[in-house]
């Protein structure tokens, strides 16, 4: 192992390399190295034409993280699960300056593992029948025919998709401490992500592994149980500028996010608690949706007679706000349910906002792709996921036709395995209804692709049931005219029952709810 500066690390990256980068959503990546790469490109024009591999692109949604690499000429293409927090990459893709592919998160984790094992492909059912599938029968589902990396395999017991592996030349990772040999600990990190698999994949390809850390010790006294990346996988270590090594883009350091300290009194407060919206009106709309979703969690908890706690999955964005409503002002860890996140964090309270992907007081950290892999354990009891659009046949897209597409997130992985599926979203966006005649891309067929045959759809105007592809209004918000405000404004047919019940009164207003099951 060799200790180098961030500028030296940036100089190691050559033109046209394929590199994989750590970080997850608002959980920081190797920011010192990314900042040095940005400066080097500005001054020299190199490296050029990079190919990026990532899970959920790290970034602050403005200028940090992978947004730093979103420069014409610097990046040529990328494969990732989503780039919501690196919208500059999405802007380049919209301008056809960069080619971005989105894969299920479970596949990306398996992709790293296949490279580490010397295999040339990943076989997975994730993505079958969606727009990722090149042989999907539905034209809405058909993938880009110019993507040769995904093919359908039909000669096995059941159809699968083959995701082709390609050599990766460098991994840019991060940890907390390194000893003189390059053993890396992660005790102050907010998750493990897929960093071990990334390092193994690059090592198998003969590439270089560069790890940014906060501290380099001068003794061999690291606790072996704390070492996540062993020295034989690490080529270079960079001591980070502390201002470029925050835990998340909203929190420089909080021991509750890394699990070093437990207790609700230590929850971080401040900007990182902000929701994804920035207007007071939209915040109120989101509050109605998340509170109504919280009641679904309450109902499932009260109805459960299992000896083990319910396993709940909160997707990124709006669903991450639901736990805050449940726990606000109360004991935050009810023993009857456990939250999981796409980032691999299990337990505790998801923070969301500018700490999206992190939880306060987590129970454990898994690799990001592990909770979503099929066959690696049971599915979740309930998944709360965001949606962008739903059409007349019950097909779901993660983005509205008028919104930028920023990757599939966990919908493709999670919905087919969840016992109960709850979809959250505003009724409209920019004046356009989210219920449309035809989605742009099929991310989920609620009729055939969801484990829950009758998913719930929650908006601020009403609650709907998806039954055999038909949207049925079952609850309506106070003051809403069903015909004028919902049916007439919808872009697809909505069936209304004779007397839809009113949405619960407690989901409206600003008063904290005294959830009866929290004692």
Listing of model-derived features with the role each one plays in the protein:
Residues 1-45, 51, 255-311, 329-330, ...:
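N-terminal glycine-/serine-/threonine-rich phosphate-binding loop
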Residues 2-11, 25-42, 53, 59-70, ...:
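Conserved phosphate- and dinucleotide-binding cores of soluble alpha/beta proteins
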Residues 197-198, 292, 296, 321-322:
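Short, hydrophobic/aromatic alpha-helical segments in well-folded domains
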Residues 71, 289-299, 342, 351-352, ...:
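Amphipathic repeat-derived elements
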Residues 125-126, 313, 321-362:
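Anionic-ligand anchoring segments at beta-strand to alpha-helix junctions in alpha/beta enzyme folds, i.e.
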Residues 20-29, 54-56, 313-321, 343:
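Glycine-rich beta-strand-to-loop/alpha-helix junction loops that act as flexible
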């Amino acid at each position: 192992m060799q200790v180098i500066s961030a500028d030296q690390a940036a100089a190691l990256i050559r033109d046209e390399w394929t590199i994989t980068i750590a970080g997850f959503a608002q959980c920081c990546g190797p920011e010192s190295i990314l900042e040095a790469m940005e400066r080097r490109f500005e001054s020299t024009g190199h490296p050029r034409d990079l190919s990026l591999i990532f899970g959920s692109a790290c970034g602050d949604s403005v200028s940090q993280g992978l947004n730093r690499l979103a420069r014409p000429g610097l990046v040529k293409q990328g494969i990732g699960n989503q780039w919501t927090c690196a919208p500059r990459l999405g802007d380049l893709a919209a301008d056809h300056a960069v080619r971005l592919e989105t894969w299920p998160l479970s596949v990306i984790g398996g992709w790293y593992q296949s490279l580490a094992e010397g295999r040339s492909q990943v076989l997975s059912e994730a993505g079958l029948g969606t727009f990722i599938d090149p042989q999907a029968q539905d034209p809405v589902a058909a993938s880009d025919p110019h993507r040769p990396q995904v093919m359908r395999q039909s000669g096995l017991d059941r159809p699968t998709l083959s995701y082709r592996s390609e050599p990766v030349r460098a991994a840019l990772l991060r940890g907390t401490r390194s000893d003189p040999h390059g053993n890396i600990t992660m005790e102050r990190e907010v998750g493990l992500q897929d960093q071990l698999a990334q390092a193994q994949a690059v090592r198998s390809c003969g590439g270089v592994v560069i790890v940014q850390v906060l501290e380099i010790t001068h003794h061999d006294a690291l606790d072996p149980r704390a070492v996540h990346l062993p020295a034989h996988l690490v080529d270079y270590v960079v001591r980070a500028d502390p201002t470029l090594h925050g835990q998340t883009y909203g929190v420089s350091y909080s021991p509750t996010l890394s699990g070093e300290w437990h207790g609700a009194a230590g929850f971080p407060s401040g900007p990182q608690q902000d929701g994804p919206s920035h207007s007071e009106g939209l915040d109120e709309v989101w509050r109605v949706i998340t509170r109504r979703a919280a009641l679904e969690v309450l109902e499932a908890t009260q109805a459960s007679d299992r000896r083990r706690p319910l396993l709940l999955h909160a997707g990124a964005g709006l669903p991450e706000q639901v736990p805050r409503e449940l726990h606000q002002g109360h004991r935050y860890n009810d023993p009857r349910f456990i939250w999981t996140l796409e980032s691999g964090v299990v337990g505790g309270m998801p923070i969301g906002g500018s700490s999206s992907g992190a939880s306060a007081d987590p129970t454990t950290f898994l690799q990001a792709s592990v909770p979503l892999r099929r066959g690696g354990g049971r599915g979740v009891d309930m998944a709360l996921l965001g949606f962008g659009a739903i059409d007349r046949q019950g097909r779901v897209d993660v983005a509205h036709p008028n919104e930028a597409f920023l990757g599939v997130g966990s919908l493709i992985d999670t919905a087919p395995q969840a016992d109960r599926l709850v979809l959250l979203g505003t009724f409209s966006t920019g004046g356009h209804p989210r219920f449309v005649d035809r989605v742009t891309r099929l991310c989920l067929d609620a009729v055939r692709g969801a484990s829950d045959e009758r998913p719930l759809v929650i908006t601020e105007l009403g609650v709907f049931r998806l039954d055999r592809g038909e949207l049925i209004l079952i609850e309506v918000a106070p003051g809403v005219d069903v015909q004028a405000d919902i049916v007439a404004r919808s872009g697809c047919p909505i069936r209304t029952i004779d007397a839809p019940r009113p949405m619960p009164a407690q989901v409206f207003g600003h008063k904290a709810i005294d959830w009866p099951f929290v004692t």
